[in-house]
Curated annotation (Swiss-Prot):
Its main location: membrane. Belongs to the G-protein coupled receptor 1 family. Neurotensin receptor subfamily. NTSR2 sub-subfamily. PROSITE patterns: G_PROTEIN_RECEP_F1_1, G_PROTEIN_RECEP_F1_2. The gene is Ntsr2. This is Neurotensin receptor type 2. Residues 1-32, 88-109, 177-217, 319-337 are extracellular. The keyword Cell membrane applies.
Amino acid sequence: METSSLWPPRPSPSAGLSLEARLGVDTRLWAKVLFTALYSLIFALGTAGNALSVHVVLKARAGRPGRLRYHVLSLALSALLLLLISVPMELYNFVWSHYPWVFGDLGCRGYYFVRELCAYATVLSVASLSAERCLAVCQPLRARRLLTPRRTRRLLSLVWVASLGLALPMAVIMGQKHEMERADGEPEPASRVCTVLVSRATLQVFIQVNVLVSFVLPLALTAFLNGITVNHLVALYSQVPSASAQVNSIPSRLELLSEEGLLGFITWRKTLSLGVQASLVRHKDASQIRSLQHSAQVLRAIVAVYVICWLPYHARRLMYCYIPDDGWTDELYDFYHYFYMVTNTLFYVSSAVTPVLYNAVSSSFRKLFLESLSSLCGEQRSVVPLPQEAPESTTSTYSFRLWGSPRNPSLGEIQV
């Protein structure tokens, strides 16, 4: 499907065959129709969902600044850039019209550069978000001091600068060239392709390093941090007493899981400094159980989505690296041809499902998202600023929202 850096060599057929056959590309019509439908669906849902996510974030600027907003914006912009540039180019020049490459040398380099840039920006943004959440859960006092919107902006700026640097080599090793020549020695215009300009050995080294840096290490870090966070959530749930229990010791981490929850801790410390014994009443009700379980499930889902969508993509690239040139049979080559299309489809699916993850990790974002979607459909509803959660009654329990902010404990809840 693609005569490029990740397309294995194939023995040259007879010169009497068609150009596509001579260049080793022959996609069946049913596959073209099927993947066109899949690409079109991914493009429509992904661009609409991520554009609406950006709209929600920008529309909520009047609200209290929150760190989640910047993470959502970074991930949505990365997904939009990937879908808007890569999907149309690949659908035209890699699915339907393999030769000649029509987007020029700059388009060739830009296509691969943007794809690598967005891949790095996405996985590094997810890793940074997981690191912030882990710190907020495990070290709430330190998180209160370190995790500010300004520092989050700087962190994400660093993520994008690093992504630019890491993706730059792809714009150097890729380029446009002619695969065939005429009888008079001039390049065959119809054989113009977007392909690799360095040796295959150099490309193999680059791919292996790229898979390690853009997938294995960031995803391992994300899984490790999310695992720590999930373990803390499970421990917190097991430590919550029954509805009739009262605790006379220092507030547990359940009260300190969010930035706003620290106000209760400070008030508790001030009460102790006056020589008064403080006691907080906490309840193990159904809503609290659901909240903790939901938080753990979301963290697992984030890792699962990127493993399912990205692992086949990188496995296919490594497949190219580890199979020698003389090991490519016609059957293996045909398998790789269609495996390429399947893995790229999954790769783009990860960008299309990011709005679903946003809605899963933040109830306030979900409310704004649905309100914006309803307004576009003609239903006018009131809009609340992101990322503030809906107010809770004073009799409710200390609820924990992994991505939102629980309410502050009131003075009336601190029994003297």
